[in-house]
Amino acid sequence: MNLIPTVVEKNARGERSYDIFSRLLKERIIFVTGKIEDYMANLIIAQMIFLESEDPEKDIFLYINSPGGVVTSGMSIYDTMQFIKCEVSTLCIGQSSSMAALILASGEKGKRFSLPNARIMIHQPLGGSQGQATDIAIHTTEILKIKKCMIELLSKHTGQSAEIISKDTERDRFFSGSEAVIYGLIDKVITCRK
């Protein structure tokens, strides 16, 4: 069962009820939660484009708690973040693993954060294929292209060399918030709002 809390706002004209995520969207906060897949990615993209149309000069805030997921779905979020005029601030709450770690790292420089006990994990893309040998070879070539692309993007956003990223993504590499700052995945660990 998926229960979503509601909030009630009162003003001079009466009351209005919102689900909590719609209310937070008014504050330009978008949640990236759970496995990244096409449906979820499309919702996030639609929210970013909507907020850009509302005010292209104001920041958008992505709150991330995700184990990662489908690379193409994550890349659609990544590409939209780069495409829109708004600066996108990212905050890891819980975990940002795999594709979610790239989304976290690709926030606006100086506006990439994590909470103190959040975990961040990078690794190479995962895949599997079956079928004829020719089809398996095609999929192998494609996943190697994706791996190269992911290494280049992580290198761009962290400042680490492609060689270091390649070595560090051979297996799961976990970071605490402070370790992620040193590595360049985020800019700061935050403990409270100011």
Swiss-Prot record:
Q: Which GO terms describe its cellular component?
A: cytoplasm; endopeptidase Clp complex
Give the active-site positions. 98 (nucleophile), 123
Sorted alphabetically, which Pfam families does this protein's record hold? CLP_protease
Annotated catalysed reactions: Hydrolysis of proteins to small peptides in the presence of ATP and magnesium. alpha-casein is the usual test substrate. In the absence of ATP, only oligopeptides shorter than five residues are hydrolyzed (such as succinyl-Leu-Tyr-|-NHMec, and Leu-Tyr-Leu-|-Tyr-Trp, in which cleavage of the -Tyr-|-Leu- and -Tyr-|-Trp bonds also occurs)
Record localization:
Cytoplasm
Q: What is its main location?
A: cytoplasm
Name the EC number(s): 3.4.21.92
Disulphide bond pairs: none
A Gene Ontology molecular function term for this protein is: ATPase binding
Q: Which InterPro entries match?
A: ClpP, ClpP/crotonase-like_dom_sf, ClpP/TepA, ClpP_His_AS
Q: Which UniProt keywords apply?
A: Cytoplasm, Hydrolase, Protease, Serine protease
Share an example GO biological-process annotation for this protein: protein quality control for misfolded or incompletely synthesized proteins
Q: What class of enzyme is it?
A: hydrolase
Alphabetized NCBIfam families for the sequence? clpP, PRK00277.1, PRK12553.1
Q: Which family does it belong to?
A: Belongs to the peptidase S14 family.
Q: How does it assemble?
A: Fourteen ClpP subunits assemble into 2 heptameric rings which stack back to back to give a disk-like structure with a central cavity, resembling the structure of eukaryotic proteasomes.
User: Its function?
Assistant: Cleaves peptides in various proteins in a process that requires ATP hydrolysis. Has a chymotrypsin-like activity. Plays a major role in the degradation of misfolded proteins.
Q: What is this protein called?
A: ATP-dependent Clp protease proteolytic subunit
